[in-house]
Amino acid sequence: MSLHFELVTPARLVRSEEVHMVVVPGTDGEFGVLEGHAPFMSTVKDGAIKVYRSAGAAPEEIQVQGGFAEVSAKGLTVLAEHVEG
């Protein structure tokens, strides 16, 4: 079982992949998303998105600046204003 994760900026699609879990720096605090998470939307603050490719794996950190996150039946989409790297 996996979560479909997409990271998008106004300029390009940065990531589109299947992962175990993603932790997002929401403006009201960090939140983790696994497959089957209830749908919701949140604004994203500047910080690191942590991508866990498998259970127990060390996270890959992706620095983002602002944006929105949407969790739906299709997975997690983060629309970031800017992604470093």
Curated annotation (Swiss-Prot):
Is Repeat set as a keyword in this record? no
Membrane topology according to the record = Peripheral membrane protein
User: Where is this chain's protein located in or outside the cell?
Assistant: Cell inner membrane
What organism is the protein native to? Answer: Novosphingobium aromaticivorans (strain ATCC 700278 / DSM 12444 / CCUG 56034 / CIP 105152 / NBRC 16084 / F199)
Functional summary from the UniProt entry: Produces ATP from ADP in the presence of a proton gradient across the membrane.
NCBIfam families according to UniProt = ATP_synt_epsi, PRK13449.1
This protein's encoding gene: atpC
**UniProt subunit comment:** F-type ATPases have 2 components, CF(1) - the catalytic core - and CF(0) - the membrane proton channel. CF(1) has five subunits: alpha(3), beta(3), gamma(1), delta(1), epsilon(1). CF(0) has three main subunits: a, b and c.
Classify the source by domain of life. Answer: Bacteria
| CDD domains (alphabetical) | F1-ATPase_delta
Q: Give the protein name, as stated in the record.
A: ATP synthase epsilon chain
